[in-house]
Regions:
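Periplasmic alpha-helical coiled-coil/stalk elements that build and connect Gram-negative outer-membrane
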Residues: 11, 35, 133-248, 258, ...
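Membrane-embedded beta-strands of outer-membrane beta-barrel proteins
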Residues: 100, 302-304
Length: 425
């Protein structure tokens, strides 16, 4: 009875411990379900500082466009005029006044409206840059995730091969003890096993590097296990108009908006050829009486002031020329961006096609041939008709072909992801 009671208690204790361990794992940062590419993209887009920064810039220009179209605040004038300093008697002199007035400045030409339009173009530029930042972020996350997937999958392939090599080491040691093989076979088997361990260590280091790169966008989730399935990307569009896709790209839209904003700077500079003016109205209160005994009349004054842009050679002309050069610079920058995007598209499209051909070659021929060669070498070695060195070369060739097949598939997907940055998926 006592023994049964103890067994029941032990089972309950084990169950409780398992529950505690599972519960603890659920709350460990980085522990969780396998991370898919889609999840990584969504996590990265949640709070990317570049995107948020451009969005804030766009809102700031939008707010500025409202203030840019508003007239300057009017000025209120208060004062005492022509006060006698011997007595400070406001009724002593006929010209003494207490004045109150208001003045309003009016900027040159249509400068307010043009400045508003310029701020609106700058807002559109920042909005487009936010969209471009989103595309770049998704592309960067895809590149890092694909590279991470390669390292994880490559490590699994090497682990499978290591188990085979470990068995071969055991077999050669047994055969050596029985006198059926020489010592060189044992040494070579151990050497190849150590080389596999070295390759695994290098791959593990790269895996950790890509996880750290991914962590800058998604945090501790980057250290989760990743999905075993090969990452799927949106399909590339068929029959795409490349020039239209590039012209409508957010980066080009941002550059184009900058060009339009620079053109508005030219229009603003041209407004300096027009006079700026101001209007003022003031009222003067007078105290005391006239010599005939009547009360002194108050004074009212209305003025219009404006400047005359006579000397334009070294000021207005230079400002217009400066604005024109800035516009040219913005246009050249947009042209360069167009060329860069076209270069990226052409390069990645050719890369994707070449890798697609190589994937077909590996799937249709190389993988099966390498596997058949490996099996044949193993059977031949077991039958005593081939040397151990030939067997090891066949096994290593199969490993290299499997790793290269994985590399080609990942490289094709990487080119695919970079093409999607251009086409917008």
């Amino acid at each position: 009875m006592c023994q049964t009671h103890i067994d029941v208690d032990n089972n309950a204790l084990k169950t409780s411990c398992c529950l505690i361990v599972v519960s603890a794992l659920l709350f460990i940062p980085g522990a969780g379900f396998a991370l898919s590419l889609d999840q990584a993209e969504k996590l990265a887009l949640k709070a990317d500082p570049r995107v948020l920064g451009y969005q804030s810039t766009a809102r700031s220009y939008e707010e500025a466009s409202v203030s840019d179209s508003t007239l300057p605040d009017p000025r209120l004038m208060l004062g005492a005029v022509n006060v006698p300093v011997d007595s400070f008697d406001l009724s002593q002199e006929a010209m003494t006044q207490l004045k109150v007035g208001i003045q309003q400045d009016f900027p040159r030409g249509s400068s307010l409206e043009i400045k508003q339009q310029q701020s609106q173009w700058l807002s559109r530029s920042a909005t487009a840059l936010a969209q471009d930042a989103r595309r770049k972020l998704v592309s960067d996350v895809r590149q890092a995730y694909l590279n991470l997937y390669y390292e994880v999958a490559a490590l699994e392939i090497i682990s499978e091969t290591r188990r085979l090599f470990s068995n071969l080491v055991s077999i050669t040691e047994s055969n050596y003890a029985a006198g059926r093989v020489n010592q060189q076979d044992v040494v070579q088997a151990s050497l190849e096993l150590s080389r596999l361990d070295d390759r695994a260590a290098k791959i593990k280091g790269k895996e950790e590097g890509y996880r750290a790169e991914l962590a800058q966008w998604i945090g501790d989730q980057a250290w989760n296990p990743i999905d075993d399935m090969f990452p799927l990307l949106p399909e590339l569009p068929e029959d795409i108009d490349v020039n239209a896709a590039i012209t409508s790209h957010p980066l080009i839209q941002a550059k184009n908006a900058r060009v339009n904003a620079a053109r508005k700077s030219i229009d603003i500079a041209k407004q300096d050829y027009k006079p700026g003016w101001s209007a003022s109205l003031d009222y003067g209160f007078r105290s005391g009486d006239n010599p005939d005994g009547s009360s002194r009349s108050d004074f009212a004054t209305a003025l219009v002031n404006f400047d005359i842009p006579l000397f334009t050679t070294d000021r207005q002309d230079r400002r217009v020329a400066s604005s024109q050069e800035k516009t040219n610079a913005a246009r050249y920058e947009m042209d360069d961006a167009l060329r860069q995007l076209k270069r990226i598209y052409d390069k990645e499209l050719h890369s994707w096609r070449r890798h697609n051909e190589r994937v077909s070659l590996y799937q249709d021929s190389l993988l099966a041939s390498a596997k058949d060669n490996s099996r044949a070498s193993l059977q031949a070695y077991q039958s005593g008709v081939t040397e151990f060195n030939t067997l090891m070369r066949a096994q290593i060739t199969e490993l290299d072909v499997r790793l290269e097949n994985l590399r080609v598939k990942v490289d094709r997907a990487s080119a695919h992801a970079r093409l999607l940055y251009i086409t917008g998926e």
